[in-house]
């Protein structure tokens, strides 16, 4: 099966070297209409977001990763985002997380950053 062959190739590549970064588009949802957004024209398409299980499979097969970039739409609209961060920390030894946000949910971001700093202390 093509998928198994791809996963096998991906695993062997990662056994030899570490990925610098992975970019994860966690949601197509957004609570704003920013003029400069690269995704604004595609928001109306209502494509399905990756499930947590699909993201878990990515994490389990990716090997060690230096930086995790999460984007979207608006990443803070994804309720399971803290679990996604923690999973990549455990499975992939990420050292940095980068997440652009429109800043419309500051209390949620502050809560998540505190949780992340507690559960993933050596990650920025």
Predicted segment positions?
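Conserved alpha-helical substructure of the radical SAM core
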Residues: 2-123
């Amino acid at each position: 099966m093509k998928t198994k062959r791809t996963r096998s190739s991906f695993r062997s590549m990662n056994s030899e070297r570490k990925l610098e970064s992975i970019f994860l588009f966690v949601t197509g949802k957004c609570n704003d209409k920013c003029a400069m957004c690269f995704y604004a024209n595609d928001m109306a398409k209502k494509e399905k977001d990756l499930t947590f299980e699909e993201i878990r499979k990515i994490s389990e097969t990716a090997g060690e990763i230096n930086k995790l970039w999460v984007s979207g739409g608006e990443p803070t609209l994804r309720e399971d985002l803290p679990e996604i961060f923690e999973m990549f920390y455990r499975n992939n030894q990420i050292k940095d997380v980068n997440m652009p946000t429109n800043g419309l949910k500051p209390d949620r971001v502050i809560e998540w950053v505190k949780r992340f700093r507690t559960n993933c202390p050596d990650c920025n």
